[in-house]
């Protein structure tokens, strides 16, 4: 089924984290190729913007969106789409995304 109500965004692994006293959902979805991951990450970003989200400043190639008083973060790394769903603030969301990116690199799976 489609994750977070986003058509075509499926086969998504989600996990709950407790970060800075808040419960946050993070996700990873492996795609066929880096190009497919980029397209999917852009579709996720566009979904939140279409439904009233506001883009915030973030690191290069990382979408940070404020929507309904929560923060969404989405990016692609190789064949992976990585994101954080409904974080309480930008800093917490970006810190969790960075943990996931680092973990993928540690295990030798950079998504390529």
What do these predicted ranges mean?
Residues 1-112:
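Soluble, non-membrane globular domain cores that form compact, hydrophobic packing
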């Amino acid at each position: 089924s489609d994750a977070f109500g986003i058509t075509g965004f499926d086969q998504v692994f989600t996990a709950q984290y407790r970060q800075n006293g808040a419960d946050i959902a993070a996700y990873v979805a492996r795609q066929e190729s880096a190009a497919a991951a980029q397209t999917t990450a852009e579709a996720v970003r566009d979904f939140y913007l279409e439904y009233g989200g506001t883009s915030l400043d973030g690191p290069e190639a990382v979408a940070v969106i404020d929507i309904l008083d929560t923060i969404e973060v989405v990016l692609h790394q190789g064949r992976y789409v990585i994101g954080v769903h409904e974080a309480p603030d930008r800093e917490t969301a970006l810190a969790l995304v960075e943990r996931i990116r680092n973990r993928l690199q540690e295990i030798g799976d950079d998504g390529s």
